Swiss-Prot record:
Species of the source: Bos taurus (Bovine)
Taxonomy, superkingdom: Eukaryota
UniProtKB keywords: ATP-binding, Cell projection, Cilium, Cytoplasm, Cytoplasmic vesicle, Developmental protein, Differentiation, Flagellum, Kinase, Magnesium, Metal-binding, Nucleotide-binding, Phosphoprotein, Serine/threonine-protein kinase, Spermatogenesis, Transferase, Ubl conjugation
Name of the molecule in the record: Testis-specific serine/threonine-protein kinase 1
SUPFAM superfamilies linked: Protein kinase-like (PK-like) (SSF56112)
Amino acid sequence: MDDAAVLKRRGYIMGINLGEGSYAKVKSAYSERLKFNVAVKIIDRKKAPTDFLEKFLPREIEILAMLNHRSIIKTYEIFETSDGKVYIVMELGVQGDLLEFIKTRGALQEDDARKKFHQLSSAIKYCHDLDVVHRDLKCENLLLDKDFNIKLSDFGFSKRCLRDDSGRLTLSKTFCGSAAYAAPEVLQGIPYQPKVYDIWSLGVILYIMVCGSMPYDDSNIKKMLRIQKEHRVNFPRSKHLTGECKDLIYRMLQPDVTRRLHIDEILSHCWVQPKARGLSSAAVNKEGESSRAAEPPWTPEPSSDKKSATKLEPREEVRPEPRAEPSPEEEMATVQVSRQSEAVGLPSEQPSKTEEGAPPQPSETHA
């Protein structure tokens, strides 16, 4: 029995193809019971790899069944046929995904970015409170409803965190996701804290929201990792970002996992909190204070305001004190992550080169 006939028997009228891979595809469908369109993910067990069938698919099904949050794509039904096909009926993101939205309309104004980022962060807090981690946060996995609200989707790499006998979360060893959104510890191929990994990806997403470009160029992973570990972040001056917004991004893109923000600290950050009240404010831990030493706020380096004749735009660069080059032992390990910046069609920002011992000059990029 073909997919259309299977869905018809379950009360769905199959529509157009929304996406397709080697062993899974997503179709739109009209639900005769719900009286609106849905998305149906169809997975063919006969074509899927063993690792996916034994580990990732059971995790995804278990987690989808337990999640219920206004900013997470709803799962209406999961069923399987005798010929080995799994059907996951989900809420449809009628306005597409955030990446296409930004590619079409450009970077978001801070107020719009604040609203969407608060919705996303609230969804991540909900997951983390359940000890669920996503591990593949990226703009393509953030769908938009009819009112352009964020809906977190694609829990294919998600998992429930395990705890040891003392109650501490155990480290993850599966290196997954997209390189452009991956934290330094993941790129190095070492066991990592999955909740902390999610926070780094949130920082990349917020940067893309307000800048319309990638914070790092993943065409050279080794170079990108070095820049990340030096805690260098560039911001386009033309966007006129507030210091509070830059500060939040800078703290999320912290290479030191012991100093990277927690989700409660993000939701209580001064950029998110003042104007986020009323937007799922119950998810915000207003009284939560960090027990860690406070990191100094972001401050730009002094730089020239001159622009080049080729209409290149100065960049404000954030960078700490110079550090020694990494030792051979710190070189990046090979990990199974995909390059992202070329595929998504967004430019990436790179810091400018400076002479040794000289103060950094403003980076430039095409306007």
